[in-house]
Structure formats: structure tokens, C-alpha cells
Curated annotation (Swiss-Prot):
Organism: Mus musculus (Mouse)
A GO term from the CC aspect: cytoplasm
Protein origin, superkingdom: Eukaryota
A GO MF term: identical protein binding
Keywords linked to the UniProt accession: Cell projection, Cilium biogenesis/degradation, Cytoplasm, Cytoskeleton, Phosphoprotein
Protein's name in the database: Centrosomal protein 20
Location relative to the cell: Cytoplasm, Cytoskeleton, Microtubule organizing center, Centrosome, Centriole; Cell projection, Cilium; Cytoplasm, Cytoskeleton, Cilium basal body; Cytoplasm, Cytoskeleton, Microtubule organizing center, Centrosome
Spans annotated as Disordered: 136-174
Positions carrying Phosphoserine: 144
InterPro entries registered for this protein in UniProt: FOP_dimerisation-dom_N, LisH
Length: 174
């Protein structure tokens, strides 16, 4: 008869081979977080920038089937449970989506934009300095304490498309 240790090892191997063990661990972590999370303590209000960033991350996580990670992000950040409208995100980010396949996360299109690099002779300001705060204030800047009138500068460069990163699109198509 097999020992308890041997049975545990066989069970663990079986769950790993089926791809279930990782999902179980993620689900347990999410449930533990939800149990420990104090709903009575109000979350700080999200800045406009954080709302957009969190939504891009949520879209990416859900696309890649990281649903438990996404649930923790929503709970921990105070992001609305109902996702923001994709067209709203595109307008707010000044992005352009040429692809008819709107299932690919906008984050992939943004990545494609930066991998292309700036037009010849132009400096990419978004990568050389922060648009959220001046360089002299970087030590004291706190995202949750920015004034309401502090906004992300709109980039007037070329618009982002999701079709310009075929390698990423192929890598994520399942």
C-alpha cells in the first residue's frame, strides 16, 4: 500500500500535468486576499491616470486568463468591477485601433508604438521624462496625492495600432 507521502506526490504530479495546480494556487491566493481584505476601510479615490492604467492591466490580465490576478487587482486598487468601455479607453489614450479584432488588449498596441520608436529626428518625450510630474519633484511625488488638475500630456505623435506588432499578436493568439 502507498504511503501518504507517495499519494501526495502522485496527486501533485497529476494536478501539475493537467495544469490545475497553478489555477488552484492562484484561486487560493485570491480567496485568502479577499478574506483578509477589510471592506470597511475606504480605498483612496483613483486618479484619472491610475484608472486608465489599471484598466489596461485588467484587459491584459483577462486576455491572458489571469482571472484571479485580475480579481485581486480590482479588489486592491478600487477599480470599478464593470470594465471601462474600450472605445472610451481608446479616446482617452489618443490611440487608434486599425485592427478589426478588438479582442487583443490595447497594451499590445501601445507596446508596438514604443517598439517602433519615434519618427526620424524626433525625441520620444514620453520615454525620457515623466509626464505626471516634473523631474525636480520625483522624490516627493505620491500618485494618490496629486492635485486633480494634474493630467497626463496627450502625445501628438503617430497613433497606436494593434496590427503593427505581428510577433506579439501571434504570440498571444491561442
Amino acid at each position: 500500500m502507498a504511503t501518504v507521502t507517495e499519494l501526495k506526490a502522485v496527486l501533485k504530479d497529476t494536478l501539475e500535468k493537467r495544469g490545475v495546480l497553478g489555477h488552484l494556487k492562484a484561486r487560493i491566493r485570491a480567496e485568502v486576499f479577499n478574506a483578509l481584505d477589510d471592506d470597511r476601510e475606504p480605498r483612496p479615490s483613483l486618479s484619472h491616470e491610475n484608472l486608465l492604467i489599471n484598466e489596461l492591466i485588467r484587459e491584459y490580465l483577462e486576455f491572458n486568463k489571469y482571472k484571479y490576478t485580475a480579481s485581486v487587482l480590482i479588489a486592491e486598487s478600487g477599480q470599478p468591477v464593470v470594465p471601462l468601455d474600450r472605445q472610451f479607453l481608446i479616446r482617452e489614450l489618443n490611440a487608434f485601433e486599425e485592427s478589426k479584432d478588438n479582442s487583443i488588449p490595447l497594451l499590445y498596441g501601445i507596446l508596438a508604438h514604443f517598439l517602433r520608436g519615434p519618427p526620424d529626428g524626433a525625441q520620444n518625450v514620453l520615454l525620457t521624462e515623466s509626464t505626471l510630474h516634473p523631474a525636480t519633484k520625483h522624490l516627493s511625488w505620491k500618485p494618490s496625492r496629486r492635485p486633480d488638475d494634474d493630467h497626463v500630456r496627450k502625445d501628438t505623435g503617430p497613433r497606436t495600432t494593434t496590427e503593427e506588432l505581428p510577433a506579439a499578436a501571434q504570440a498571444v493568439s491561442r
